[in-house]
């Protein structure tokens, strides 16, 4: 079989797996879905499924990475329109918070996989690349919209990233709304900058 066709078939199977896992996770939550159900929905064998992701956690990373990439793209475009540092940071983190909170159980499991998953797996590697990209976007945006130099902007970006992770992972935030979480992060960032959150 020609390489081109083989690669097309691989990509087509990957897209079927992605679509099946995405739908099942969205409807039932990652904890209530089996790999067999995903394989059946994608019309492939479980052996084939494990060639693309070695665990259910990896499958969740595969699905959620795409959503987080889209959220980061949306946040980047929105932040480019802002001139105030707090508004620009809000513009970046809001789509990420909404993405994570679309299904709270899946969002929390995703964060756990990002933090503690197998770093040698491609989907985990991609999730870490998204974290780095989000921090770089934050740093660039902070430097553009504030009086901070590049080093301090990078430090604040890491702090915002940590605040975001903690806010999404904290047990007390399970019942919080996306709007409340974004507002809480805004207040914390404003405190770091020494200015009112609603300035």
Task: Walk through the language-model features, giving the residues of each.
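Amphipathic alpha-helical segments used for helix-helix packing
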Residues: 100-121, 169-172
């Amino acid at each position: 079989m020609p390489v081109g066709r083989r690669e097309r078939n691989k990509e087509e199977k990957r897209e079927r797996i992605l679509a099946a896992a995405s739908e099942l996770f969205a409807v039932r939550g990652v904890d209530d879905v089996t790999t067999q159900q995903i394989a059946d929905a994608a019309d492939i064998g479980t052996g084939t499924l494990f060639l693309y992701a070695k665990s259910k956690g990896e499958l969740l990373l595969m699905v959620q990475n795409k959503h987080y990439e889209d959220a980061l793209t949306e946040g980047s475009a929105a932040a480019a329109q802002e001139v105030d540092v707090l508004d620009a940071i809000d513009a970046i983190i809001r789509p990420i918070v909404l993405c994570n909170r679309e299904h709270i159980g899946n969002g929390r499991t995703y964060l756990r996989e990002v933090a503690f998953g197998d770093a040698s797996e491609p989907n985990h590697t991609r999730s870490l690349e998204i974290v780095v990209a989000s921090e770089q976007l934050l740093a660039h945006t902070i430097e553009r919209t504030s009086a901070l130099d590049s080093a301090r902007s990078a430090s604040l970006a890491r702090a915002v990233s940590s605040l975001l992770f903690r806010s999404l992972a904290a047990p007390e935030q399970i019942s919080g709304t996306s709007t409340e979480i974004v507002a809480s992060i805004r207040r914390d960032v404003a405190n770091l900058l020494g200015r009112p959150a609603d300035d």
